[in-house]
């Protein structure tokens, strides 16, 4: 949700021209022989373990170390690489996510409950943070075993960060490619269910591509379907899909609601046609309650608010339709929660829902490039008590709170087979 991004992205994304020259493959373009050849091209890679350096979530700065074995040698994982574009590699391995996580935890040996350890594949210190996909067993139970996230900056855990060569958002003020000071809602859901999360969401994304490098949800679906084809024993029916987008379309790109409805419907059609059965959907929050709209006209606020309300009715209708068809659909009313969260934060354990925790006093995407101090009120109370981290995006405490509400027994998600 970054306003007036085109000039900034031109400077930020040196790989954008490469992306334009290398169109993303579709699953139909990957032959069975290429799949077999790729899977047989076995190699190994190293694991980069990231962690928060501070004991407080008020400080999002991170650092990393190579994962090591108990004898001090470098820990490696066997598998194979594949990519649809030159800089977006994924490493497929039979090593489980739990084994990799445990090796990172043992290597770092941190007595820090807020370390928020995460890990990526990397061949050398100059590599990007590449996703590690753990292949499924040939014999697997009929239950959810992973989460796939599609969407925008509310779900992005590092894609735009990689594309900007680790500069956007600034890692000293935003947590390692997250538009927050820590984990986002999809990560909290995955952790609560002890499942790996695979992120296709991109900060700034709309339903369709914007400015070359901002991969829209339509192309995110294409990318997911293509990468999934290279995975061994993968069953889409055993994946929980999260889908949230639309705010960028209305706030930043002035797209009409009919266009966004079409993108949303197409994403669900393509996913279900590919075998997806389990979905976590959400209504859009009223973005005009975010601090950035202190700097907007009432006309702009009314226009965006009306679009959000209309889009939410469509999302509800889509959820009802697919549920009637027998799909496992959980629709969480994020809009209703944010209404009470922003109007009465104290009732939810927060103290401030009108100001950002970071000391930012304008609405400008340029600010994502800089390091910012905390607002004095946030420094006093702690980021855990603020609803918003910057002028647009929630704190990790808000993300965690929303995820907890999603996981409550009163919601359908609690009834899924995990």
From Swiss-Prot:
InterPro entries the UniProt entry points to: GDSL, GDSL_lipolytic_enzyme, Lipase_GDSL_AS, SGNH_hydro_sf
UniProt keyword annotation of Lipid metabolism present: yes
Residue intervals passing through the bilayer: none
CDD domains: fatty_acyltransferase_like
Keywords: Cytolysis, Hemolysis, Hydrolase, Lipid degradation, Lipid metabolism, Secreted, Signal, Toxin, Virulence
GO MF, one example: toxin activity
Subcellular localization: Secreted
Pfam families (UniProt xref): Lipase_GDSL
Signal peptide: 1-19
Main location: secreted
Keyword DNA repair: no
One GO biological process term: lipid catabolic process
Cellular component GO terms held in the UniProt record: extracellular region
Role description: Phospholipase hydrolyzing both fatty acid esters of phospholipid, i.e. it hydrolyzes phosphatidylcholine (PC) to lysophosphatidylcholine (LPC) and then LPC to glycerophosphorylcholine (GPC).
Protein name: Thermolabile hemolysin
The organism of origin for this protein: Vibrio parahaemolyticus serotype O3:K6 (strain RIMD 2210633)
């Amino acid at each position: 949700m970054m306003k007036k991004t085109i000039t900034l992205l031109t400077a930020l994304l040196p790989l954008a021209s490469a992306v334009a020259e290398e169109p993303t493959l579709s699953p139909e373009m990957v032959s069975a022989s290429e799949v077999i050849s790729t899977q047989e091209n076995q190699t190994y890679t190293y694991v980069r373990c990231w962690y928060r350096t501070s004991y407080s979530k008020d400080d999002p700065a991170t650092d990393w170390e190579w994962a090591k074995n108990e004898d001090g040698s470098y820990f490696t994982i066997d598998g194979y690489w594949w990519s649809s574009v030159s800089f977006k590699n994924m490493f497929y391995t039979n090593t489980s996510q739990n084994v990799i996580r445990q090796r990172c935890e043992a290597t770092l040996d941190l007595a820090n409950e807020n370390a928020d350890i995460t890990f990526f594949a990397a061949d050398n210190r100059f590599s990007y943070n590449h996703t590690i996909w753990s292949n499924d067993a040939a014999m697997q139970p009929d239950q959810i075993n992973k989460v796939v996230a599609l969407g925008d900056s509310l779900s992005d855990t590092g894609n735009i960060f990689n594309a900007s060569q680790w500069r956007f958002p600034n890692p000293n003020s935003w947590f390692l490619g997250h538009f927050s000071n820590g984990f986002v809602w999809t990560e909290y859901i995955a952790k609560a269910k002890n499942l790996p999360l695979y992120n296709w969401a991109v900060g700034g994304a709309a339903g369709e591509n914007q400015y070359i490098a901002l991969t829209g949800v339509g192309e995110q679906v294409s990318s997911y379907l293509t990468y999934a084809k290279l995975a061994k024993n993968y069953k889409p029916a055993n994946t929980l899909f999260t889908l949230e987008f639309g705010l960028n379309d209305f706030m930043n790109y002035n797209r009409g609601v009919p266009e966004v409805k079409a993108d949303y419907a197409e994403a669900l059609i393509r996913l279900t046609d590919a075998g997806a059965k389990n979905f976590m959907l959400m209504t859009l929050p009223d973005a005009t309650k975010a601090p950035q709209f202190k700097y907007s006209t009432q006309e702009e606020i009314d226009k965006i608010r009306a679009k959000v309300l209309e889009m939410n009715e469509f999302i509800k209708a889509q959820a009802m339709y697919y549920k009637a068809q027998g799909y496992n659909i959980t629709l969480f009313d994020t809009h209703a929660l944010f209404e009470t969260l922003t109007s009465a934060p104290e009732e939810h354990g927060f103290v401030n829902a009108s100001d950002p925790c970071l000391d930012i006093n304008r609405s400008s995407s340029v600010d994502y490039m800089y390091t910012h101090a905390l607002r004095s009120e946030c420094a006093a109370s702690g980021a855990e008590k603020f609803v918003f981290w910057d002028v647009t995006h929630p704190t990790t405490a808000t993300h965690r709170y929303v995820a907890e509400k999603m996981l409550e027994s009163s919601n359908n998600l609690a009834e899924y087979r995990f």
